[in-house]
């Protein structure tokens, strides 16, 4: 059954998180990040989060968004992931975001048959509304 294109533009509720230095260091340790940018609080500008740190904000929320759109998360595979960094995340940043369905496409593969491709976009903004990161994530499901 085809994914209903009317879900394009559907948004999750808004979420707000505050970036913490301890969480940056925990994440950096977990992913093996050795850069002093993530560890040296005394360096000019202080520490910054590793590039993929924002994934912890969205943990579990993407599955909820798929479900809210009537999509079975167990049928979808991760297809593509793009992150645009407008500036680094720093301790104390208050970040607001929501997840939005950006696009729904249908593609026919020679061997795989018809597939639905759903793209979500998340824009992380700081307390004054400036973009910090833009994340586009694409999921693929065979019919």
Please describe what each predicted stretch is:
Residues 1-80:
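Hot-dog-fold acyl-thioester-processing enzymes
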């Amino acid at each position: 059954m085809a994914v209903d294109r009317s879900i394009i533009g559907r948004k999750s509720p808004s979420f707000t998180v505050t970036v913490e230095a301890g969480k940056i260091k925990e994440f950096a340790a977990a992913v093996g990040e050795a850069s002093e940018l993530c560890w040296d609080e005394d360096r000019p500008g202080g520490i910054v989060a590793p590039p993929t740190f924002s994934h912890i904000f969205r943990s579990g929320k993407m599955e909820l968004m798929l479900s809210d759109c009537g999509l079975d998360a167990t049928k979808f595979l991760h297809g593509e992931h793009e992150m645009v960094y407008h500036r680094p995340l720093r301790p104390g940043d208050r970040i607001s975001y929501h997840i939005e369905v950006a696009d729904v496409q249908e593609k026919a593969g020679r061997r795989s048959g018809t597939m639905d491709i759903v793209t979500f976009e998340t824009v992380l903004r700081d307390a004054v509304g400036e973009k910090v990161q833009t994340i586009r994530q694409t999921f693929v499901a065979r019919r």
